[in-house]
Amino acid sequence: MKKYWIPLTMLWFVLVAASPEPQWTLHTVQPGETLSKIVRLYLPYTAAYTKKELVNSIKSINGIDENLSPGQTIRVPVVWDAPLKPKTVPKAKNYMAKGVYMNPSSAGTRTILDTGYKLRLRGANTVVFDAKDDMGAITYPSNLKAKYFPNEDYTPNIEELPKMIDYLHHMGVHVVARMVVLKDPIMAKINPEWCINREKNWLNPADPNVQEYLLAVVRELSDSGVDEIQLDYIRYFADTKTATGMDGVSRSDTIAGLLKKIHDITAPKGVLLSMDMFGIVIWQRDVDVLVVGQDISKLKPYVDIISPMLYPSHFSKGFSGIKNPADDPYLFVYDGIKRMKDLVGDEVVIRPWLQAFPLHVTKGFGPGYIETQIKAALDAGATGWLLWSPENRYNYSFEAMQNVMNYKPETKVASLGGKGTPQKVSNKPNETDVIEQQPVPATTNGVNPPHVDLQPTVPPEAKQSSLPPLRPVANSKPFFRSIP
């Protein structure tokens, strides 16, 4: 274990020694200016992740409180002369993404950075954050607000999307923007005529206005620097109906057409496109396809990755003769992936969502439960995996990740047509790299090792800002904590 940690420690010392001195700019308080207004002006040019962090840092550096006087000069710890402009890190669609979901609250704080760091130590590499959530809210400062929801009064959870992406990229984290597509309470309230089911806040995917809005969000995200856009709820509401309002056009045709338009935006920019899918849809029963419109044969040309939601707890009791599917995680994950691979062949990568929450589990939920699902996914031929905990409780998950770092998938034979645990047939090596095999240090004296990339590089094409010139202050200390 020590042999992996020593090179990392040496690398950190080298980079820290080469880091530039902290930089500051002097700001003269104007009449009517508050500390909050000043922070909003400078936040993109500092290493602070949130406005609250920067407020506290300015107060500490200058020995002041919230009260400011016109003409007063304060130091602001500016480290860049232009806002960050992260770029997408293009990857092949069979990139072995292994990671977790982060809700808007976590993404709006250093929790997401701390999680990215913990993932990298345990051989994982991916964070999925909500860019457009289940309530229809865009979770970052968007340029679309003025046109589409000018009167909506809400504060985005993520104050600095470019900074979040840049910091995660510097950790080697694959950044995925989750976009809830057709379930949208905000737009349903503003434009009820856009809905196909107003009671359920479900937008009509065939409506040109709906498509225009959704494509605008996709364009904005594609230009933000994220590495992948993941579409959720890109389907009709499960209402037992099959009509679209257009003669000769099925629900599956409509969903496939919308997906194609989205793919036409993401593909030229090197942004991967993935979509979530009900676990039950994998069985492709006619009634499910006709109602929700997710016909895999029509969708697969326009998506790079499909993430079936194979949560054992979401299968009804007695499904395929299994008394409580939540207590048989290996069988449902393994068989679901096998069925999906039979449907899409090699055209689309399968990367499942796995259950990292205890719903309906009666036989001991813990690290072993999550580890079992990961092994089932890899044994079935999945390319990576994602863990879902709505509350982002991942302590069990981190332990499971540690346990499967060097796992070699096993080829097995299983089918939910029968019962029993799949039997091992043969072994095959798994896909992993040197970085992902680095173990967690046995001890760090109670302190996480500092992250090495404290000051991401400003892109060369960034324009000069109109802020005052930077003025390094001698013998000053950087306010910015290590990432995370």
Q: Where on the chain are the PLM-derived regions?
A:
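Catalytic domains of carbohydrate-active enzymes, especially glycoside hydrolases
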Residues: 113-137, 223-228, 302-305, 380-384
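Aromatic-lined carbohydrate-binding/catalytic grooves of carbohydrate-active enzymes
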Residues: 122-156, 238-245, 401
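Glycoside hydrolase catalytic-domain groove-lining segments
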Residues: 249-277, 282-285, 291-359
